[in-house]
Amino acid sequence: MLDSKLLRTDLETVAAKLKTRGFVLDTAQIDELEAKRKDWQVKTQELQAERNSRSKGIGKAKAAGEDIQPLLDEVANLGDQLEEAKHASDAIQAEIELIYAGIPNLPHDSTPVGNSEDDNVEVRQWGTPKTFDFDIKDHVDLAEARGWYDNDAAVKIASSRFSVLKGPMAKLQRALTQFMLDSHTDAGYEEVYVPFLVNQDSLHGTGQLPKFEADLYKIDKHEEHDTSDRDLYLIPTAEVPVTNLFRDEIIDEDTLPLKFTAHTPCFRSEAGSYGRDTKGLIRQHQFEKVEMVQIVHPDQSYEALESLTQQAESILQKLELPYRVMSLCTGDIGFSAAKTYDLEVWLPGQQAYREISSCSNFEDFQARRLKARFRKGQDKPQLAHTLNGSGLAVGRTLVAVLENYQNADGSITVPTALRSYLGGVEIL
């Protein structure tokens, strides 16, 4: 969430920056609501002062032996008016906060200005796409030919956009997950295990609610014994529960930066992606991801973004998978992000680079919603900066390994970095 003071004092500048994201801020509506809020605030203060004054007069009138009933009636009437004013003021404030909750973050000055993914800027490439001397297959054809992938079973059990992996392919996915976690913990990240179901406060804190509820899976509660008054949702990413570890917390500045990694399944409805990547593991309702989250001092967040991105890159480099780093433009960055790098891995089966990681600096946007703060000694608490990045999307990494390491006979050479996780096996 943006700073409400900034929205009140520099609304036109905010609107101009948001316009580069393709977001049109209704400044007239905000001005009107802010004017109403101020009017009700003044009226409430005036009624409060008047009631206090009349209340003091009751004591004096009583001491003088005067009839105090008229004063009591006036105070009661003022109390009713004050209650109405407070309700009106609260309603206006709630309307303002709902609007503010739907406003995306301001892009950082270094974020390229553009309208769509076509305007994203390549920062660097690593590795060279392999040239094959045989007709290559995509990951679905490779896996189905070996009996490792069963889409029909997944549709029978659940629906489309789910997968059943078998034998070596299931083991390879597990090996990738363990390899990623080990790489991150070796680099100083603390591994955490977190809930896969979260409440509305958690999703609001990281920016998924209220704007993106259609992308989430909400749990309907039917049991009579369930007396919980909180709706729960399946997590779309580990970013949500891990970052929310620090909701309503004040952290000692000396402990910063805090770095965490977690492996979780992720669940997304993929609303709006009808007809895209319907085949295989690229776009699923349920998928595995290893996530990295950092809580840092505001002065260090852009240095942290570079470090976070390089850590995600290190996984691809160890697996010797060609990739490129893209700086997302203002029209393509996520709702909560100020700056984002996407890592795109080369997929021979598609003859294209595809996203495999997104690394973002949210500055204080999430922290303001979360009330995630830090302080030095007894100083006043300050909002921290939050960052997160995929390290990596496990299913897409599995796709990249299968397609880049395929052999003419349909076998798969195991990347050197993974062999110790598969008992030394070199060929699948």
Swiss-Prot record:
Keywords: Aminoacyl-tRNA synthetase, ATP-binding, Cytoplasm, Ligase, Nucleotide-binding, Protein biosynthesis. It holds the Pfam family tRNA-synt_2b. GO terms for molecular function: ATP binding; serine-tRNA ligase activity. Its EC number is 6.1.1.11. It catalyses: tRNA(Ser) + L-serine + ATP = L-seryl-tRNA(Ser) + AMP + diphosphate + H(+); tRNA(Sec) + L-serine + ATP = L-seryl-tRNA(Sec) + AMP + diphosphate + H(+). InterPro entries: aa-tRNA-synt_IIb, aa-tRNA-synth_II, aa-tRNA-synth_II/BPL/LPL, Ser-tRNA-ligase_type_1, Ser-tRNA-synth_1_N, SerRS_1_N_sf, SerRS_core, tRNA-bd_arm. One of its GO terms (cellular component) is cytoplasm. PROSITE patterns: AA_TRNA_LIGASE_II (PS50862). ATP binds at R268, S269, E270, E355, I356, S357, S358. The keyword Secreted does not apply. Pathway: Aminoacyl-tRNA biosynthesis; selenocysteinyl-tRNA(Sec) biosynthesis; L-seryl-tRNA(Sec) from L-serine and tRNA(Sec): step 1/1. GO terms for biological process: selenocysteine biosynthetic process; seryl-tRNA aminoacylation. L-serine binds at T237, A238, E239, E291, S390. It comes from the Bacteria. It is found in: Cytoplasm. Homodimer. The tRNA molecule binds across the dimer. Catalyzes the attachment of serine to tRNA(Ser). Is also able to aminoacylate tRNA(Sec) with serine, to form the misacylated tRNA L-seryl-tRNA(Sec), which will be further converted into selenocysteinyl-tRNA(Sec). Consists of two distinct domains, a catalytic core and a N-terminal extension that is involved in tRNA binding. PANTHER family: SERINE--TRNA LIGASE (PTHR43697:SF1), SERYL-TRNA SYNTHETASE (PTHR43697). NCBIfam families: serS. Belongs to the class-II aminoacyl-tRNA synthetase family. Type-1 seryl-tRNA synthetase subfamily. This is Serine--tRNA ligase. It comes from Hydrogenovibrio crunogenus (strain DSM 25203 / XCL-2).
